Amino acid sequence: MPRLERNVYKGLITSLSRKKPSNSLAVKESPLLTKFERWSGKRMKLFFESEDSFEHYGLRDLKLPHNMLANKLASPIRAERNTRYRIPKEFLIKLNLYKDATNNVLQLKANFNGVTGLGTTYIHNNKKCLEMKFCDISRWSSRQPLKVPPLPIVADKSALLKDYENQLIRELNECFSKLKTTSKHDHNTVKLYVSTENNLLMDVDTQGSLCINLQSITDKLPHTMLETVTNAPIHISAYSNMDFLTTLHRLLGYYRHRNR
């Protein structure tokens, strides 16, 4: 049997890779998951070859512009201050710094009506969570404009939350005065009622209407609204009362899981 030269053996050994091949497959992650904020706020559409294709797959018009939850989920994504989770901003409270001319300080307040302020950030829209952990104001010093000396930052958690609660109730009362009820009971309507028989916050009835139980916030509702829904359930058009429903859902989320 012929023998190979020593240098041939050496060449074969050194030419082999000592690194074990990886068995894992390289999976490309969708930019919708990794950089979702770049896509938020844009209306995305699905295109089919023809209208017949839409019917062929058994799809129907979901009327998402009439859907309160769909509209909230479609809002731009923002990072929550404490957890850094990226959440649609309609589920968060927007905070800004505002100058208090009287005391010459910067106050941290909830930005409810979109008034321009400094150092925008977002926190959970839930009172119980905020009572346990509020945002650290020491990190805000770099967010104010250059001043010599810089203005001190003041954040009164109790006053901030109380002011936010008052704004929510005031906005809800104003929207309720313009409420448009309907006699229809379908997937385009929302049923408002008060019941102690179940703990469900939201449900969908057999006719497709979204049902919202206001039992958990009866002590926060404006008197006229509470009296109306307590006497009998009311049905409202989802599309015509979107501002009211958005504020109501924000109020429900804020007081969810509170100690009663």
From Swiss-Prot:
Keywords: Mitochondrion. GO terms for biological process: mitochondrial genome maintenance. InterPro entries: Rrg8. It comes from Candida glabrata (strain ATCC 2001 / BCRC 20586 / JCM 3761 / NBRC 0622 / NRRL Y-65 / CBS 138) (Yeast). It is found in: Mitochondrion. One of its GO terms (cellular component) is mitochondrion. It comes from the Eukaryota. This is Required for respiratory growth protein 8, mitochondrial. Pfam families: RRG8 (PF17068). Belongs to the RRG8 family. Required for respiratory activity and maintenance and expression of the mitochondrial genome. Its main location: mitochondrion.
